[in-house]
Amino acid sequence: MKNKVRTIHMVGIGGSGMSGIAEVLLNLGYAVHGSDMSDSAVVRRLRKIGAEIFIGHGAGNVSDAEVLVKSTAVRDDNPEVLAAVEKGIPIIPRAEMLAELMRLRTGIAIAGTHGKTTTTSLTAAIFDVAGKDPTVIIGGRLNAYGANARLGEGEYLIAEADESDGSFLCLFPIVNVVTNVDMDHVDFYAGQKEIDEAFVTFMNKVPFYGANVVCGDDPGVRRLLPQVKRRVVTYGFGKDNALRAEVTSCAETSVFTVFLRGGRLGEVHLGQPGRHNILNALAAIGVALEAGISPEHCIEGLARFGGVGRRFERRGERDGVTVVDDYGHHPVEIAATLATARSVYPDRRLVVVFQPHRFSRTQALFGEFCKVFEPVDKLLLTEIYPASEKPIPGVSGQSLAQGIRQVSNTDVTYYQSFDEILAALPGVLRPGDVLLTLGAGSVTTIGQRYVAGE
């Protein structure tokens, strides 16, 4: 029955969640076409491997589709959605398509407010080294694949599970990971209670023979554990965790020893710096051990891991300035990234360009955003990246800059456009500085343009 549908249309096919699914569907032999608002490297890659992609949305784009896949960011009045309704074409959310793919394999779902992409990628690296040949779908470009997805021949599908719209509850994995539970996605959840309920439901969806691998150091996770009725494996730095790390160093690289219920598994050398990445690696080890992978393969896989795009990614140098780019856009993520930057570059001046992401997040976490940039020597702040949201009165990049000045000593300047920032950078930067671009939107282009000499 499932083979009756062969032609799939994806609205917003270039998005981080959609593109990986599209790539796997193409590799499975489905005809995939889709649309996106702009051309991009992701769109070009999908075209290269066989997808037909339209720039812009139009009713004619769905003419021969047998099913339409969309993310929750796509509105019901989108012309392609309306055309599908008129033609009687089934419309399904992105997560439902991911759930169908997961049904073909033994599913592993990586969830949490922060660290999902890196943890998914680290898990995939271990499974690759162990010869498991997994199918992998993540939200960022994995350097080892040159893409954010691959179709494997093995039994496992390792996927990043998106809690932002509750869609991770569509999945039926055998093993779950929860890296942390923080307040976020206020455009969807009414408050922390709703977020907590979603994660509890997620953890209780694993079968009786499955497991939840969770960060025992995270207060949000610990708060929920009494409500979890399925098996739990905790990881972290605390001695009460089942899987524990003792850190030797986490500056340029991370070196740590792993213990399982008191027994030493071995020393890990990870190329990525930062305590948050050690936690991500512990989660990956926990999943691998659940799959019967040896500690030796875990250590080898982590040692070989080549990183993920936009996760403390070094983009180059210009005039003695080192340029680093990071996806961090929530105060907790930003704090971890700044701590890593200070650890890796302890004696260098840190200049940050930050593009806030979503009006709703900026409003809900305004106080945290105002305080998190204290470790920065100079902050250049630009306008909020809307991510399909409508503006909220009184919430802007400029109002955030004013708030930062009121509650902290951070040296902050607001710029309305990227061109203004690029024009200002030569007067701000000095040889030996580190320029860090931060945000989930388009801010990465500033580092690219600066290195290119624009």
From Swiss-Prot:
Subcellular localization(s) per the UniProt record: Cytoplasm
Principal localisation: cytoplasm
Pathway it works in: Cell wall biogenesis; peptidoglycan biosynthesis
Reaction(s) the record says it catalyses: UDP-N-acetyl-alpha-D-muramate + L-alanine + ATP = UDP-N-acetyl-alpha-D-muramoyl-L-alanine + ADP + phosphate + H(+)
Listed GO CC annotations: cytoplasm
InterPro entries noted in UniProt: Mur-like_cat_sf, Mur_ligase_C, Mur_ligase_C_dom_sf, Mur_ligase_cen, Mur_ligase_N, MurCDEF_pg_biosynth, UDP-N-AcMur_Ala_ligase_MurC
Pfam families per the UniProt record, alphabetical: Mur_ligase (PF01225), Mur_ligase_C (PF02875), Mur_ligase_M (PF08245)
GO molecular function, one term: ATP binding
Keywords annotated in UniProt: ATP-binding, Cell cycle, Cell division, Cell shape, Cell wall biogenesis/degradation, Cytoplasm, Ligase, Nucleotide-binding, Peptidoglycan synthesis
Biological process according to GO: cell division; cell wall organization; peptidoglycan biosynthetic process; regulation of cell shape
Domain of life of the source: Bacteria
Binding residues annotated for ATP, in chain numbering: G112, T113, H114, G115, K116, T117, T118
E.C. code: 6.3.2.8
Family according to the record: Belongs to the MurCDEF family.
HAMAP family per UniProt: MurC
Function: Cell wall formation.
Protein name listed in UniProt: UDP-N-acetylmuramate--L-alanine ligase
Organism, as annotated: Nitratidesulfovibrio vulgaris (strain ATCC 29579 / DSM 644 / CCUG 34227 / NCIMB 8303 / VKM B-1760 / Hildenborough) (Desulfovibrio vulgaris)
